[in-house]
Amino acid sequence: MGNIIQAQKGESFFDPACGSGEFISEIIKNQVAISGSEYDVDRLKISKMKMLVNDLSPSNISPSYFTEGHNLKKNFDIILSNPPFSLKIPFDMEMHFCMYGKPPTSNADFAFLQYCIFMLKDNGRAA
């Protein structure tokens, strides 16, 4: 996946469901500014360790649900992620990013896709 996205040095990268950091590990070699979020604390620790092993600060990897803490629109050149399929949307989740209709609360897949689009810069790329 990292090869498909063709990250260039100096671009900004975000994985809103970074898990154990597989995409982060893959994209690190392209010298991009890396950010990520993960709600599972154990997976988050693995992501941060992978960043440390590569001499990068893990400070841009945050412990959060994919929609928390990133309220600015169009922040990133690249979004590469494995969606957290079949998550339920928390009842109180803010939906400011839903440009294409309110997603069902029974499944966060549509919300996740809208969030990724919302977070991309105008000429950004996602996979």
What are these regions (language model features)?
Residues 1-81, 86-88, 94-99, 106, ...:
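Conserved S-adenosyl-L-methionine
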Residues 88-89, 124:
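Short acidic/glycine-rich loop or secondary-structure boundary segments that cap or lie
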Residues 97-100, 125-127:
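Short, flexible active-site loops
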Residues 105-127:
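Conserved Class I SAM-dependent methyltransferase catalytic core
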